[in-house]
């Protein structure tokens, strides 16, 4: 059985350890950590010890750990050096995930965001923590949309102060003061500074965002504020209908929302603003709509909508749903291919997932989408819920249709 002792360190080239930890190091035979960690602790390691570099792919690293376990019947102890608090987005979490049977003892130090808050004399009990280290933008987007007052960000070399600042500017989040901490804990290299677009920021670094002003968006984004397809006012789901549609989708308890036939993107954008926890996949066949949804998303501060262009019937639904299956789907347009589209949706729809469509009753509309919907639900074994009929001003009546798996 493997035993791990995980010791947190800062970027200080002359680390301080309590006597208990120093004794553990003196008795150690197998050590592990990143190359930077090795440089810092090398003077403290006993002679004739083994060091295992923590590099990607991590499966190779854990393969070496497991080989050590098989060489002796006795318990093997591996002493791992990790940054800051090893249980704070750290390597101790990875050990628990990869080797849940292993025995782990942790000796933490302050993590980088704690140190940055300390340097700024900034209370951080309400800090929203976002890790972008090897991760996508979802959690940062969510924190910005929610208007969190204090956001601490763990960066990597790709998602760095400049790319983060650019993304925030693109979507209108200029209401935050950005402070960057570099090489925290290293007396010679540590630097705390406000964001400067001309600066070169060294790695490792972390970021603190402090909100300087609130942004208020109404419940129901005004239709007139959206860029439209060829200026056609009827090519947008009107705000009251949009809100009723989102209500029918049960989005507060959903995880993955697909918007098929997004056109201006109004439904996706409204959903993103109201329910930023959602993963949103938006589909559209008309190429001119791609620029429109991106323009509207930037205008309304709705980052993180994944856009897919092309005929939905040609989309590989399985590849889009690789990580999570959709549990809420809105069909905003079907081009007369409703049954085929619904069949493709049902092939990847999560258990208890819902599909919603708005059926328009107009004199010049020859295709009865309500009838096609009823037939598709029956053929696909979907359970329909009572429809909701509504008419807005002098527009054509709309029936909000809903079914579930």
Task: Locate each region found by the language model.
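S-adenosyl-L-methionine
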Residues: 285-323, 330
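Conserved SAM-binding loop of SAM-dependent methyltransferases across substrates and taxa
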Residues: 264-276
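Class I SAM-dependent methyltransferase SAM-binding "motif I" and its flanking Rossmann-like core
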Residues: 12-13, 83-147, 313, 373-391, ...
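A contiguous loop/helix-start segment that scaffolds small-molecule binding in enzyme catalytic cores
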Residues: 2-6, 18-20, 78, 149-234
